[in-house]
Amino acid sequence: MNNSILLLAFSLCTLIATGDHAQDDYILTREYAVTIDGTSNLRDWKENVGQVTGDMTAIVNSDGSVDLVSIRIKMAVLSIKSDMGRVMDNKTYDALKATRYPDILFTLSTPLKLSQVSDCPQPVPVQGDLFLAGVCRPVVMQVKTLALDRGKLLFEGFEQIRMTDYAVKPPSALFGTMKAAPDITIHFKTNFIKPALSTLLKNQ
């Protein structure tokens, strides 16, 4: 029996066995994109987060709605790379206190139901806690959710934050000539999949 047949059989068995109100665990795949956008007195700048991990518990109902029970996403500070080069990278690590707090962490604080998981999803407010540089603050992100093939769930959205709210001093470079503004926007696109399906897909 080839992997495609195994994958189909697993998906059908899962659908029949669970129905509504069955919680499933998901893991974050490597198909993600997380960027940090900001501006300065000289020009706009962008940073890419290279290492992101996460897990989620959700209920996919027969009517197409999704109940989000828990989400945890972790971003490695030292994997952040700037389009302004290594000097800006090091300034970012210092500003985020990477030695003491190596990860940026988001956790869902309020479970919610997503009634529209369609080809054209509308953004919904998702409440969570953002832990950054040793400070934890509540956030409300606008998130779109899309159900993909092979049991994947895609989440796409953004969050605007002010660095000084997290006791982070905006980084500067070029001997202080370039000074970053305190407001930044975190954009993200993440895919979650059930661990067993992830294993089958890797073996195809």
Residue ranges and their predicted role:
Residues 1-7:
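Bacterial N-terminal signal peptides that target proteins for export
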Residues 7-15:
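Bacterial N-terminal signal peptides
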Residues 20-204:
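Low-complexity, acidic/polar, glycine-enriched regions of mature
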